[in-house]
């Protein structure tokens, strides 16, 4: 979309995209070139992924003593909320190097993000990329302002408000590229959320598999502050590793039967691409719980984990739910080791009722 040459493709043929940070670095380099009298239509920068990548200039405007350049972000075949957004850099000569955030770039208000509180939410790798890019052009001190028009509105669709990044988006990226279907930005924000919780003194967090699960978890665990609740999606393994790294002592995993069933099957990435629910496992748990022959026959034809939940409820088989969460907890605890302590709770779909939790059901209200 914004590049003069086709972006690279992965082994499956999907287009690789480029991070907000890579676009910001390319925009800053183009603006620095324009400060020296050039009018670049294309600039290339070095990506941490290991190659030089050209970027096409979308906007170049001389304003006062500086130059504004805009690039259109192309996230490839894994579009995120910033796909198609304009990433701008305004660059001018200064007495010393300064990197600032402009319109649509958030400000860090809580510790734990790797960026000092009060600074623009431009992560360490993009910061380095920006300065390396402009240093290819000039050694003179520069003031660089990164902006994302419309970023404040786009940020409402991200985890930034929960992370304490206010007023706009984060400038992210560790490699400069967005791998198709990696959901790398979301994964990174989930890991950051764990770090923010710990940096603000929390030793116990609740990791939920979705927005609905999070609402249920907040009712089940009223002793936890809002910051402790982290919507992890499919990334339970990432949450546990992040918790271990920063010293979180307790992780309470709260979810519905589809995701919890995958955890019970030993999966630490529960996206559909990571495999289907093991219905044979659920059938064996139903048998262990004492299901009637009629229920077992119906379960043998079931196509979803939800149907197993319905059958267990109809039969009054609380043991099915207990054994399921116990198995999930044991698999997750074995995966991460002794610390953090892992607790798993299963809710229904509609009322947020806790059907079972292991090993400390008494902690969960309802």
Swiss-Prot record:
GO terms for biological process: anaerobic cobalamin biosynthetic process; methylation. Keywords: Cobalamin biosynthesis, Methyltransferase, Plasmid, S-adenosyl-L-methionine, Transferase. Its EC number is 2.1.1.195. One of its GO terms (molecular function) is cobalt-precorrin-5B C1-methyltransferase activity. Pfam families: CbiD. Transmembrane segments: none annotated. It catalyses: Co-precorrin-5B + S-adenosyl-L-methionine = Co-precorrin-6A + S-adenosyl-L-homocysteine. It comes from the Bacteria. Coiled coil: none annotated. Pathway: Cofactor biosynthesis; adenosylcobalamin biosynthesis; cob(II)yrinate a,c-diamide from sirohydrochlorin (anaerobic route): step 6/10. Belongs to the CbiD family. This is Cobalt-precorrin-5B C(1)-methyltransferase. The gene is cbiD.
């Amino acid at each position: 979309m914004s590049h003069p040459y086709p972006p690279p493709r992965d082994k499956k043929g999907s287009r690789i995209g480029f991070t907000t940070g890579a676009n910001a670095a390319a925009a800053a380099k183009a603006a620095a070139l324009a400060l020296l009298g050039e009018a670049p239509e294309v600039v290339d920068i070095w990506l941490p992924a290991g190659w030089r990548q050209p970027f096409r200039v979308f906007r170049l405007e001389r304003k006062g003593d500086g130059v504004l350049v805009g690039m259109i972000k192309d996230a490839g075949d894994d579009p995120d909320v910033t796909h198609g957004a304009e990433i701008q850099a305004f660059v001018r000569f200064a007495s010393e190097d300064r990197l600032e955030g402009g319109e649509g770039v958030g400000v860090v208000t809580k510790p734990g993000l790797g960026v000092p509180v009060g600074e623009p939410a431009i992560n360490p790798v993009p910061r380095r990329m920006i300065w390396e890019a402009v240093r290819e052009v000039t050694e003179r001190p520069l003031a660089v302002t990164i902006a994302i028009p419309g970023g404040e509105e786009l940020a409402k669709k991200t985890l930034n408000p929960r992370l304490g990044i206010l007023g706009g988006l984060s400038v992210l990226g560790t490699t400069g590229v967005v791998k198709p279907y990696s959901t790398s930005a979301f994964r990174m924000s989930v890991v950051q959320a764990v770090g923010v919780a710990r940096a603000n003194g929390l030793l116990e967090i609740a990791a939920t598999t979705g927005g609905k699960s999070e609402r249920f978890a907040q009712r089940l665990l009223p002793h936890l502050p809002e910051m402790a609740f982290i919507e992890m999606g499919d990334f339970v393994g990432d949450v546990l590793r992040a918790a271990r790294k920063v010293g979180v002592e307790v992780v309470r995993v709260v979810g519905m039967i589809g995701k919890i069933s995958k955890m019970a099957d030993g999966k630490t990435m529960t996206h559909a691409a990571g495999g289907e629910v093991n219905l044979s496992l659920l059938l064996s748990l139903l048998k262990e719980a004492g299901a009637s022959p009629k229920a077992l026959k119906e379960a043998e034809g079931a196509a979803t984990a939800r149907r197993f939940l319905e059958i267990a409820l109809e039969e009054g088989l609380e043991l099915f739910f207990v054994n399921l969460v116990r198995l999930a907890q044991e698999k997750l605890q074995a995966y991460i080791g002794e610390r953090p302590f892992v607790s798993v709770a299963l809710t229904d779909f509609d009322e947020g009722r806790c059907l079972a939790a292991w090993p400390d059901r008494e902690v969960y209200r309802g």
